[in-house]
Amino acid sequence: MPSCTASTMPGMICKNPDLEFDSLQPCFYPDEDDFYFGGPDSTPPGEDIWKKFELLPTPPLSPSRAFPEHSPEPSNWATEMLLPEADLWGNPAEEDAFGLGGLGGLTPNPVILQDCMWSGFSAREKLERAVNEKLQHGHGPPGVSSACSAPGVGASSPGGRALGGSSSASHTGATLPTDLSHPAAECVDPAVVFPFPVNKRESASVPAAPTSAPATSAAVTSVSVPATAPVAAPARAGGRPASSGEAKALSTSGEDTLSDSDDEDDEEEDEEEEIDVVTVEKRRSSSNNKAVTTFTITVRPKTSALGLGRAQPGELILKRCVPIHQQHNYAAPSPYVESEDAPPQKKIKSEASPRPLKSVVPAKAKSLSPRNSDSEDSERRRNHNILERQRRNDLRSSFLTLRDHVPELVKNEKAAKVVILKKATEYVHALQANEHQLLLEKEKLQARQQQLLKKIEHARTC
């Protein structure tokens, strides 16, 4: 973590008020004694110490590069954060002391300067603002770009992996001091820490006119912010243009190195990348109890207005599938699977009903909501209850009428239905027998009538 109290000289407190940024103060010190007895200006920790920090606390710093302890200039946050060129601060002795002049030619993969678990964006913005102010105040000539490592642009969350941001670090030719030949061996190779392949685009050799090399930056577990596309450094006074090897994109596991330029703000805005969310689709899976959300992100770097040749914008599309488990009771049906069948109907019990039962209404289509299906079921059940009650009332009234027509059961109000049916059957048979006898008697009477009529006719003729 960059701060005034670097690991090279932990006992020294930065006294420059311009360099004292609250968000850049260290969260953890390498040694507790240095924290409490660092110097006369060091203040003991108070209750409001965590109010100064906008970022989350990080693990202790990784060991810095092997700087000589007795350097002419004390280390500060700017020298720890920047990779100065020969003419950035105008102090070649400081460049030789820190051995950063020819760092671009040490190894094909640059060194890892920051921790892998740093995350945050406000420190990068303040750092860029501070560097721009320093460059505008005359510390360096305009037009010279410096590679600034932003500790949070492409950093992944703790436990996540970062694809590694890429940027261009333009180094002008400078010789490497002899006493700094050993830091390259102590630096960590990014291929060891981050074994995944990273696509690097080598830019061709550019002429004296400055051009822009677009860079893409994205993270797997977190969407990265737009990274400033670097501008290649102009040719030196000797006439040698910046080589393509020096303008290679840096690839680290925990950081994105940015190139900070003191050009106009509109030029920097033209060189920023645009991250467009192309599609955010959310589909439901009917086979399991989880929903899958897919985010498709397209990163399109803008081409610089300064370049003579127009570079082709590279697009990096990331898809992030996040299984969302919103159901904890796995015995219950899934909320994402729409039920195609209505709830089972209760069996209808009939008591000696001669009427055939109605067929069960088929299940509703799955387009109907459960609330509508429940309301229809309750209405159907209510109608069924009404019809069943009416049927029972009609049956009871029929039994009462039948009981009233049976002479033996007229005064028996507590007669059972079986008794009513038996007595009514006997009474019907008795009535039928009586009817038959009456019919026979009627026939006899009619025959007697015919005989009497014949006698009357015979009497008149005589």
UniProtKB/Swiss-Prot annotation:
PROSITE patterns: BHLH. Keywords: DNA-binding, Nucleus, Phosphoprotein, Proto-oncogene. The modification Phosphoserine is found at residues 259, 261. Changing residue 58 to M: Results in decreased phosphorylation and subsequent protein accumulation. Residues 19-47 are annotated as: Interaction with AURKA. A motif (9aaTAD) lies at residues 76-85. GO terms for cellular component: nucleolus; nucleoplasm; nucleus. The 9aaTAD motif is a transactivation domain present in a large number of yeast and animal transcription factors. PANTHER family: MYC PROTO-ONCOGENE. This is N-myc proto-oncogene protein.
